[in-house]
Amino acid sequence: MAIDSPSPATDSIRVMLVDDSAVVRGLVTRILEGEAGIQVVASVGNGQMALASLERNEIDVVILDIEMPVMDGLTALPKLLQIDPGLKVIMQSTLTLKGADVSLRAMQMGAADYIPKPTSTRDLAGGVDFKSELVTKIRALGQARRAGARPARPGGPPATRPVIASTSPRTPVPIHPPGPLQLRSNTPEPPDIIAIGSSTGGPQALFTVLGTMKAGTVRQPIVITQHMPATFTTILAEHIGRVSGWEAREAQDGEAIRGGRVYIAPGDFHMVVETKGTDKVLRLNKNPPENFCRPAVDPMLRSIAAAYGKRVLACILTGMGADGMKGGQAVVASGGTVIAQDEASSVVWGMPGAAATAGICSAVLPLPEIAPWIMKLAARR
């Protein structure tokens, strides 16, 4: 049964739940009802019902299950985005290889993010981690949605929404950093290594950057920290390999870094670089989370700055929070270069915005311009 709620206050983030389990929808609704500034305005059991509900309601964020009768999540996703291109869709997926693969395919198709689905309704009802992650992502994506104009629909002009001022008490850092853009006026050094950090919206940004920067276009190794759990990072490496032709894989502890390869931090491990004789090697550790994340971008960048000095190019892509900003400061202090994705092309301009407004970036670029910028600088080495 489809449920449409009365129109909420205009400053609420409007959420639609799409899941064939009425029990799951009910539990998630109860979680969100206790959060100020969030309201579930529709709750439906399959993709076809979601399309009909989207035509009737103004929605900011959709929580979309993958496996459903009548119309599944992957089939519904492009249809939802066709109706409302600015819609933020969070895929709900199991922590399995199949679930990770489908979630990453969905992000290639335009989904903004994913959330691991608890394995039982008991975990769903009582899981503090699930609630915290869900609410944080809804707030981040809802705010990103409101930061610009809602795309026009047939029969009416576009409607702008106010930026949401309230944040969840569990949200660890500001979603959108304050302050003006501040660019460095330095001459970037050609790099010996390229480091990329990303979070919310990161997989599709990585596919764009690496898909443009095909294997063989640069000789330098590429190291990536994307905020993701184990299993998902395994599949991320496979997807990057397919779209780019690079030899891409999860990093292994102690392996020497080689040019022309892509190394991805495994879920639940920080990835850092150490010097061992004449080699640079990757080390994995379970040191405490930084910026509430493991893997985190900051420890990766700090270690690379220490190992490579000025021959580092760090790129901060879309993501909530400020992970990568302090690590970027270490890169700049060692003479290296930092660039970031611009606000207009970011799903959430938290991480790149923090770097851009901290005065450490040599360039802040639209997503399609990042790979050409990297390739031009890398070719000088």
Swiss-Prot record:
GO terms for molecular function: phosphorelay response regulator activity; protein-glutamate methylesterase activity; protein-glutamine glutaminase activity. The modification 4-aspartylphosphate is found at residue 65. CDD domains: CheB_Rec, REC_CheB-like. Phosphorylated by CheA. Phosphorylation of the N-terminal regulatory domain activates the methylesterase activity. It is found in: Cytoplasm. Involved in chemotaxis. Part of a chemotaxis signal transduction system that modulates chemotaxis in response to various stimuli. Catalyzes the demethylation of specific methylglutamate residues introduced into the chemoreceptors (methyl-accepting chemotaxis proteins or MCP) by CheR. Also mediates the irreversible deamidation of specific glutamine residues to glutamic acid. NCBIfam families: PRK00742.1 (NF001965). This is Protein-glutamate methylesterase/protein-glutamine glutaminase 1. It comes from Paramagnetospirillum magneticum (strain ATCC 700264 / AMB-1) (Magnetospirillum magneticum). The gene is cheB1.
